[in-house]
Amino acid sequence: MARRGAAVAEEPLLPSSGIVGIGPIEGINWRTWLVQVFCFALTTSVLFITLVTASLPQTGYPCFYGSLVDYTQKNHSVVDGVWMRQIAGGVAPTLFLETTSLVAFLYYTTLVLVAISFYLIISAVLVRRYARGKECTAVAGCTRPTTTLIASHVTLVLGTLATWLLQVVILLLSHKQAVLGAAVYVVHFVSLVFFCMSFSGLGTASAQYSSNLRILKTNLPALHKMAGPGRAVMTNLGMGMLGISLPILSLMLGIILANSFHITLWQTVTVAVGVFVALGLMFLIIVELIVSHYVHVLVGPALAVLVASSTLAVATHSYFVHFHAMVSVQAPNLATASKAIVGIMAVISIIMLVVRLVRAIMFHKKRNTEFYGRVKTVSSKARRYANKVRGPRRNPQPLNVAESRGMLLAEDSETDAEEPIYDVVSEEFETEYYDDPQRVPERSHRREYR
């Protein structure tokens, strides 16, 4: 029986060795989880089909969802810097992403949701396979805790809701219902936030999450690949999906304000840029303080915010070019201030990316993990290969005996310094990694890297 670690206050999610098989409660939970996985996969498939068909002019959709605003038409609505006055009788277009950017972001979101559905299907197949095999004898009732480590029931419900709402947004934008589509997108974003956070943390503490993964790796290593490294990849993709949704949300709020209140053109731009910066900073802080405890190598959020900032900067530049006269009258410094703020946001995302990578390396180096050992091995091999390729180019002429002997000594010392030094695991890591002192590990104390 696995003993409780000093840092874990809860009982392990995975039960210890005992009765073999699945009880009635676990059976109901397993079938319900399968139905939810099927519904999520079906919803993502329908979303992908809807997105593809809405992109083709031959399918019968009245409009293209990506062309939400048109800056080419002459504006007749601005009189003394005020929108929608009865004297003018027109509507000025609001700031929004360019067509290619919006289409790319929606396709990325859809493909990530499809990838998560494939991840869940593969995990369900593996769970069913090992639940009926001899491997299940090591963990009593392994179906229920393993599915909880893949995705909880609440996570699947939130994911299905977010996917369906995104499909509704695409249909509304295809019929040019911009305000209603923007309102639905706000609800979609809220559900997407809860889905990504629930998928990342599984509703448990980070210490308990790590303990469950260690127990799962000991008893069911095949499923550990899905619950451990597989979830890390899906978490990076999911957080990236959430990051690129930030500019769309901020601009959707601008559309709602512009079509609901009597405001000027510069105010909608200010609201959109301000909301994006505020949500972007909050997103990066939450990822660094909370999500990074579950997945340490987490580069998706910072990269997503960087891409989102660049895309929003391009959109604002194009907007100010088309409406330079009106913006210069209402707010002369708006263009410069908006570009500077978005640029600062991009720089902050780069800084947070570097901070996350440094902290991840320090974490794995301190614990002498397999990940850090493999990274050192790959980097040393790449450096030796680069030196081998560049060596003949730096010394095209034959060397004398002294120079040859000096180069050989330097090469030997460099090679010795680059050999991985993390093959032997420290006693502290052995105590932390293996909770059961009576279990004899199959491996020796020296790690093997493939």
Curated annotation (Swiss-Prot):
The chain crosses the membrane at residues 32-52, 102-122, 154-174, 179-199, 237-257, 271-291, 295-315, 335-355. Keywords: Disulfide bond, Glycoprotein, Host endosome, Host Golgi apparatus, Host membrane, Host nucleus, Membrane, Transmembrane, Transmembrane helix, Viral envelope protein, Virion. It is found in: Virion membrane; Host Golgi apparatus, Host trans-Golgi network; Host endosome membrane; Host nucleus inner membrane. The gene is gM. It comes from the Viruses. The keyword Coiled coil does not apply. Envelope glycoprotein important for virion assembly and egress. Plays a role in the correct incorporation of gH-gL into virion membrane. Directs the glycoprotein N (gN) to the host trans-Golgi network. Residues 1-31, 123-153, 200-236, 292-294, 356-450 are intravirion. InterPro entries: Herpes_glycop_M. Interacts (via N-terminus) with gN (via N-terminus). The gM-gN heterodimer forms the gCII complex. It is a multi-pass membrane protein. One of its GO terms (cellular component) is viral envelope. It comes from Equine herpesvirus 1 (strain Ab4p) (EHV-1). Its main location: virion. Residues 53-101, 175-178, 258-270, 316-334 are virion surface. It holds the Pfam family Herpes_glycop. Belongs to the herpesviridae glycoprotein M family. This is Envelope glycoprotein M.
